[in-house]
Swiss-Prot record:
Gene3D superfamilies: 2.30.42.10, Arfaptin homology (AH) domain/BAR domain (1.20.1270.60). This is PRKCA-binding protein. Ubiquitous. The AH domain mediates binding to F-actin. The unoccupied PDZ domain is probably involved in allosteric modulation by forming an intramolecular bridge with the AH domain leading to a 'closed' formation. Binding of a PDZ ligand, such as GRIA2, allows enhanced interactions with F-actin and the Arp2/3 complex thus enhanced inhibition of actin polymerization. The gene is Pick1. Probable adapter protein that bind to and organize the subcellular localization of a variety of membrane proteins containing some PDZ recognition sequence. Involved in the clustering of various receptors, possibly by acting at the receptor internalization level. Plays a role in synaptic plasticity by regulating the trafficking and internalization of AMPA receptors. May be regulated upon PRKCA activation. May regulate ASIC1/ASIC3 channel. Residues 391-401 have a biased composition (Basic and acidic residues). It comes from Rattus norvegicus. One of its GO terms (cellular component) is glutamatergic synapse. Monomer and homodimer. Interacts with CXADR. Interacts presynaptically with the glutamate receptors GRIA2, GRIA3, GRIK3, isoform 3 of GRIA4, isoform A of GRM4, GRM7 and GRM8; with NAPA and NAPB; and with BTG2. The interaction with NAPA and NAPB disrupts the interaction with GRIA2, conducting to the internalization of GRIA2.
Length: 416
């Protein structure tokens, strides 16, 4: 394509500087260094690295990256060669191979365009859609949309609801036990007063013993509250700190994942554009001027992928630790709860068993339960008050009649 031109096409570097260098890589057992190559004759004036594969000599060395231009292999220039020819040159070398390159000094912020931001929004929307809805709207779903970590996030939300329910139930239970302990304390005070005022020594001792039993139960209840209360603190720590921190980490991971998917989609679109122009036989400006825009997106995609991999690793580790803590913590808390409740009920049973003082014999007044013929019926204070009021009314009526005199046959009053 460029052979017909009488001049060289100037590269459009988009203001991105390059730094020359070289690196010697030791090939692996498959005679590979772990890079894929793009560009080259006849459509692009330069060859560049499209991708550096994981766990390969090039990736482990870390010198070259996606978007870097390859200028030579073992001191031999590759200008004007195709990517297939350059790949064969690298394969022909056994053992170590020296790659000459121009390092692309790209700033990832340059690749974060409005198009990438819109693609991130699209991926975020598609993430929460079903496959049928996405297909109906004509939205493509990336392969990482059905991410297992998203399901782990849903499980985390269910765990948070479980802990929230346990916390509320424990609070209500502790409140009920506190009120119950106050009731036992009131019982103890009442029976203690009765025992102190009881003149019969045996009955007094029985009432005091029964009062002490209720006061002991109140102490057992307070001890139960002090033992179970730290359980609320541990549950709240897990619910209000560990789970929100993990949830925030997963949200950061999703943001990085959507950014990586956006760059992948952008690379796919640019590849399709390039293939379409090649099929039509029309030169593409960015390709014929060094394809720097494409190489910038390749670099951004590689760095986004590195962040995505690291973030995914961190999230998986944090989720694993959180799951282990959940299993261990829930078992420990339930064991502490059950053992504390068991001890409380056993202690209460032992105290009440020792305080078996019934029936209690008490001395009542001799007239209280006397039903003989010489004894009148039992009257309480209200009946006595009513009798006194009736007697007073009769006295007043008698005095009134004596003062006014008798009545005549017609019922009218007459003077005496």
């Amino acid at each position: 394509m460029f052979a017909d031109l009488d001049y060289d096409i100037e590269e459009d570097k988009l203001g991105i500087p390059t730094v020359p260098g070289k690196v010697t890589l030791q090939k692996d057992a498959q005679n590979l260094i772990g890079i894929s190559i793009g560009g080259g004759a006849q459509y692009c004036p330069c060859l560049y690295i499209v991708q550096v594969f994981d766990n390969t000599p090039a990736a482990l060395d870390g010198t070259v990256a996606a978007g870097d231009e390859i200028t030579g292999v073992n001191g031999r220039s590759i200008k004007g060669k195709t990517k297939v020819e350059v790949a064969k040159m690298i394969q022909e070398v056994k053992g170590e191979v020296t790659i000459h390159y121009n390092k692309l000094q790209a700033d990832p912020k340059q690749g974060m365009s409005l198009d990438i931001v819109l693609k991130k929004v699209k991926h975020r929307l598609v993430e929460n859609m079903s496959s049928g809805t996405a297909d109906a709207l004509g939205l493509s779903r990336a392969i990482l949309c059905n991410d297992g970590l998203v399901k782990r996030l849903e499980e985390l939300e269910r765990t948070a609801e479980l802990y929230k329910g346990m916390t509320e139930h424990t609070k209500n239970l502790l409140r009920a036990f506190y009120e119950l302990s106050q009731t036992h304390r009131a019982f103890g005070d009442v029976f203690s007063v009765i025992g102190v005022r009881e003149p019969q020594p045996a009955a007094s001792e029985a009432f005091v013993k029964f009062a002490d039993a209720h006061r002991s139960i109140e102490k057992f209840g307070i001890r139960l509250l002090k033992t179970i209360k730290p359980m609320l603190t541990d549950l709240n720590t897990y619910l209000n700190k560990a789970i929100p921190d993990t949830r925030l980490t997963i949200k950061k991971y999703l943001d990085v994942k959507f950014e990586y998917l956006s760059y992948c989609l952008k690379v796919k679109e640019m590849d399709d554009e390039e293939y379409s122009c090649i099929a039509l036989g029309e030169p593409l400006y960015r390709v014929s001027t060094g394809n720097y825009e494409y190489r910038l997106i390749l670099r951004c995609r590689q760095e986004a992928r590195a962040r995505f991999s690291q973030m995914r690793k961190d999230v998986l580790e944090k989720m694993e630790l959180l799951d282990q803590k959940h299993v261990q913590d829930i078992v420990f808390q339930l064991q502490r709860f059950v053992s504390t409740m068991s001890k409380y009920y056993n202690d209460c049973y032992a105290v009440l068993r020792d305080a078996d003082v019934f029936p209690i014999e008490v001395d009542l007044a001799h007239t209280t339960l006397a039903y003989g013929p010489n004894q009148g019926g039992f009257t309480d204070g209200e009946d006595e008050e009513e009798e006194e009021e009736d007697g007073a009314a009769r006295e007043v009526s008698k005095d009134a009649r004596g003062a006014t005199g008798p009545t005549d046959k017609g019922g009218s009053w007459c003077d005496s």
